[in-house]
Amino acid sequence: MAITQERKNQLISEFKTHESDTGSPEVQIAILTDSINNLNEHLRTHKKDHHSRRGLLKMVGKRRNLLTYLRNKDVTRYRELINKLGLRR
């Protein structure tokens, strides 16, 4: 199921770095992580949905690139985000 606008606004308010922040790496990674988790649940029940699986792989790759960017830019923000989201990196 797609991420709702209310859930997206909740993630933005939780991970924003300043008042009008909607596009910082932290916000983008949080939204992608939520979408990835939702898509994982979908794929557990619909194992043959290869079209959605490709979308999942694209989202995981995009999140990985954003995490690498954030790690190179500011390690402390990267570590805080990883702990907050519960990612394994």
Curated annotation (Swiss-Prot):
<dbReference type="GO" id="GO:0006412">
    <property type="term" value="P:translation"/>
</dbReference>
<comment type="subunit">
    <text>Part of the 30S ribosomal subunit. Forms a bridge to the 50S subunit in the 70S ribosome, contacting the 23S rRNA.</text>
</comment>
<protein>
    <recommendedName>
        <fullName>Small ribosomal subunit protein uS15</fullName>
    </recommendedName>
</protein>
<dbReference type="GO" id="GO:0022627">
    <property type="term" value="C:cytosolic small ribosomal subunit"/>
</dbReference>
<keyword id="KW-0694">RNA-binding</keyword>
<feature type="compositionally biased region" description="Basic and acidic residues">
    <location>
        <begin position="1"/>
        <end position="21"/>
    </location>
</feature>
<dbReference type="GO" id="GO:0019843">
    <property type="term" value="F:rRNA binding"/>
</dbReference>
<feature type="region of interest" description="Disordered">
    <location>
        <begin position="1"/>
        <end position="23"/>
    </location>
</feature>
<dbReference type="GO" id="GO:0003735">
    <property type="term" value="F:structural constituent of ribosome"/>
</dbReference>
<keyword id="KW-0699">rRNA-binding</keyword>
<comment type="similarity">
    <text>Belongs to the universal ribosomal protein uS15 family.</text>
</comment>
<dbReference type="Pfam" id="PF00312">
    <property type="entry name" value="Ribosomal_S15"/>
</dbReference>
<comment type="function">
    <text>One of the primary rRNA binding proteins, it binds directly to 16S rRNA where it helps nucleate assembly of the platform of the 30S subunit by binding and bridging several RNA helices of the 16S rRNA.</text>
</comment>
<keyword id="KW-0689">Ribosomal protein</keyword>
<dbReference type="InterPro" id="IPR009068">
    <property type="entry name" value="uS15_NS1_RNA-bd_sf"/>
</dbReference>
<keyword id="KW-0687">Ribonucleoprotein</keyword>
<comment type="function">
    <text>Forms an intersubunit bridge (bridge B4) with the 23S rRNA of the 50S subunit in the ribosome.</text>
</comment>
<dbReference type="InterPro" id="IPR005290">
    <property type="entry name" value="Ribosomal_uS15_bac-type"/>
</dbReference>
<dbReference type="InterPro" id="IPR000589">
    <property type="entry name" value="Ribosomal_uS15"/>
</dbReference>
